[in-house]
Structure formats: C-alpha cells, structure tokens
Curated annotation (Swiss-Prot):
One Pfam short name: Aconitase_C
Enzyme class: lyase
Physiological role: Catalyzes the isomerization between 2-isopropylmalate and 3-isopropylmalate, via the formation of 2-isopropylmaleate.
Record key words, sorted: Amino-acid biosynthesis, Branched-chain amino acid biosynthesis, Leucine biosynthesis, Lyase
EC number: 4.2.1.33
Assembly with partners or alone: Heterodimer of LeuC and LeuD.
Pathway: Amino-acid biosynthesis; L-leucine biosynthesis; L-leucine from 3-methyl-2-oxobutanoate: step 2/4
Name the UniProt record assigns to this protein: 3-isopropylmalate dehydratase small subunit
UniProt record similarity statement: Belongs to the LeuD family. LeuD type 1 subfamily.
GO molecular function terms listed in the Swiss-Prot or TrEMBL record: 3-isopropylmalate dehydratase activity
Length: 212
C-alpha cells in the first residue's frame, strides 16, 4: 500500500448526497478479486451514456459530457469532494479500489457509511470528515475557481485552501499510523513475521503429530 503523507491536488466536486457503492462501482464489475482494473468503471452509470459490461473497451464508449469527471477542468483530480453519507449501500472493497485506481487519494465529505469509511483506510484512501458548512464553502470555491487545489497534510491533520485558510480534521491514531507508513493488514502482519516463524517452529516441536 502506498504511504500517504502530504499531497496537493486538484479537487473534483461530486455534488450528490447518499452516493452508494453500486454507483461508485456497479455490481457487474465485481467478479474480479484483483485490486486493479476498476478505475475505468468508476461511477460507470453516470460517466458513460451506454450500459457498461465487463471486458468492454472503455475508450470506445460514449461519455456523458455533463458528468463532473468528464469535464476538462477536472481532469487529473486527486481529491474528491462529496456530500453526506458517501459510500453507503452494500459492502465492497472494490469501491475504494476503483477510486484509488482512477487517481483519487482523498475524499472529503461531511459523513460516510461506516463500512466504506473503514475499507478506505485499509486500501490507502484517506476519507476526511469536515463540517457541513466547511464542505458547502469548498463546493462554492471549487465551482467558482477553475484549477482549485487543496493541500492535505496527514501528519498535521490539516486541509489548506488556496487562500491560506487551514481546516483541521480528526483521524484515529492507529489508522493515521498505517496510512503514513503504507501498512495494510498484510503489511501489519509481516511486521511480526519473525515472531510468527518463531512461534510456528516452537509449536511444531511441541506438537509434531499435527504436522505429519
């Protein structure tokens, strides 16, 4: 998992509340358990004018010109600005996978569904919670100023606007540690690899019949 320390990125505003995981990555694309290949189908039903199917050449599909991510001014965005209850609906790690592969490292919203919120941290995506009034103001500024960027400092737990105003956010210390050091569940386990091998060696000697 890529470490997350500091980043400055273009902001794309998704002005919709209660965006669910099936809207983030539709169910027909969930057959793969690999973490790659989902970016082209992020927000598929909004992003394209046709019905998406696995294995399609997305470069030949008709784009919806009204969808925010298809607008030239938001190309290359790495910060997604969203509304309340982002990531609701069914549990699927494919949702943060798709956001990450598209290029988003950060989501900013007033609130999230719990499962999506937890899955995001486990997959290198930082979901920041800001007060609704702060999010409202960000939407106004992003839409009024082309090329609007935010600077996020995870260690300091700050979001800095182009005008210099700093917004603080809370994050669980353990999740913060994992993101700063690029540690997913496998990475955390491998930190104790020597202790695990030592236990297995001792257990094999104590209970040899279990390994025959």
């Amino acid at each position: 998992m890529k470490p997350y320390t500091q980043t400055t990125g273009l902001v794309a505003p998704l002005d919709r509340a209660n965006v669910d995981t099936d809207q983030i990555i539709p169910k027909q694309f969930l057959k793969s358990i690999k973490r790659t290949g989902f970016g082209p189908n992020l927000f598929d039903e909004w992003r394209y004018l046709d019905v998406g199917q696995p294995g399609q050449d997305n470069s030949k599909r008709p784009l919806n010109p009204d969808f925010v991510l298809n607008q030239p001014r938001y190309q290359g965005a790495s910060v997604l600005l969203a509304r309340e209850n982002f990531g609701c609906g069914s549990s699927r790690e494919h949702a943060p996978w798709a956001l990450d592969e598209y290029g988003f490292r950060t989501v900013i919203a007033p609130s999230y569904a719990d499962i999506f919120f937890n899955n995001s941290f486990k997959n290198g995506l930082l979901p920041i919670i800001l007060a609704e009034a702060e999010v409202d103001e960000l939407f106004r500024q992003v839409e009024a100023n082309e090329g609007y960027q935010l600077s996020i400092d995870l260690a300091a737990q700050t979001v800095t606007r182009p005008d210099g105003k700093v917004l603080g956010f809370e994050v669980d210390p353990f999740r913060k540690h994992c993101l700063l050091n690029g540690l997913d569940d496998i990475g955390l386990t491998l930190q104790d690899a020597d202790a695990i091998r030592a236990f297995e060696g001792g257990y094999r000697q104590q209970q040899p019949w279990l390994f025959r």
